[in-house]
Regions:
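Alpha-helical repeat scaffolds
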Residues: 90-100, 128-140, 167-184, 208-223, ...
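Residue signature of alpha-solenoid helical repeat architecture, marking inter-repeat boundaries
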Residues: 68, 72, 105-111, 146-153, ...
């Protein structure tokens, strides 16, 4: 049910997504505030049963919890604009809209999110030379401490992949050395770093060293964008192994996707050249 809801939300206009999120939060805050105010008023008047007291507290708690769920729901819906709908323009636009509408307390953090999103979109569009320049504008002091490490790791991921696709060995090795020295405190961040190192290492092997590696054939991901990514690298791997029929089959499977993705343009270029 949650998956269907986030999928539907990701397909509506960006302004409506934000309005829906704000509306839900406002309603939940009002319910929580009224419940707590009534609870306080009746306690002062000493005319409230224990069960009613508990009920009001539960209502207030559920209202506050719904705000938390709504935030997570909106974050998932926004991410699906990119990973499932493959709508790069809309994805960048909603972060631009959130930045413009942010209040003075969240303006700086929304600016950092917008810069990172811009760099991410440029990567998927194949604008590899602009990726690092965009990320260089990031000010990590504007990001909440608990998110800084994850954001830094994800930046390394896109920068390293950009270097690989441009065959910039020296810069790739420099970035790899830097990320290897990081010691994330959270297990989830450690797992993310290890996964980035693994995937970039395999991509480097296939694209730069021209050495076949079956990682992308043997592993899978759930998102539509992730599947396109893995299929692209699996096709390059098949090409290295001289498996032209499989290479063609894999490239054909992604050639009808959004041509904004460099994966798709490269697939079409291969298929056109083959003809």
């Amino acid at each position: 049910m949650t998956k269907k809801l986030t999928s539907r939300l990701s397909k509506i206009a960006n302004s409506k997504i934000l309005i829906f999120s704000i509306y839900i939060n406002i309603v939940a805050c009002i319910i929580a505030a009224l419940s707590l105010l009534y609870y306080w008023y009746r306690v002062i008047n000493k005319n409230l049963s224990l069960w009613l007291m508990l009920l009001l507290l539960v209502i207030a708690g559920l209202a506050m919890y719904s705000i938390f769920i709504n935030i997570k729901l909106m974050a998932t819906a926004i991410e699906e604009i990119l990973t499932e709908n493959i709508d790069l323009e809309k994805y960048l636009d909603i972060y631009t809209l959130m930045y413009k509408k942010a209040n003075r307390y969240s303006k700086e953090e929304q600016e950092a999110s917008l810069i990172f999103t811009d760099g991410r979109v440029k990567y998927y569009r194949g604008q590899f030379q602009d990726v690092q320049l965009t990320f260089d504008a990031l000010d990590y002091n504007k990001v909440q401490k608990k998110y800084r490490t994850k954001l830094l790791l994800r930046r390394y991921n896109f920068e390293m992949l950009s270097c690989i696709l441009q065959k910039e060995r020296e810069e790739y090795n420099r970035l790899k050395s830097e990320i290897e020295t990081l010691s994330p405190s959270l297990p989830s961040d450690q797992e993310l770093r290890d996964n980035i190192l693994k995937i970039t290492s395999v991509a480097y092997s296939i694209i730069v060293e021209k050495q076949p590696n079956n990682y992308f054939d043997d592993h899978s991901v759930n998102s539509r964008l992730g599947k396109i990514t893995y299929t692209y690298y699996a096709a390059l791997n098949a090409q290295l192994k001289g498996e032209e029929a499989r290479t063609r089959e894999l490239f054909e499977s992604i050639a009808q996707e959004n041509p904004e993705l460099f994966y798709v343009r490269e697939a079409k270029r291969y298929l056109k050249g083959e003809q």
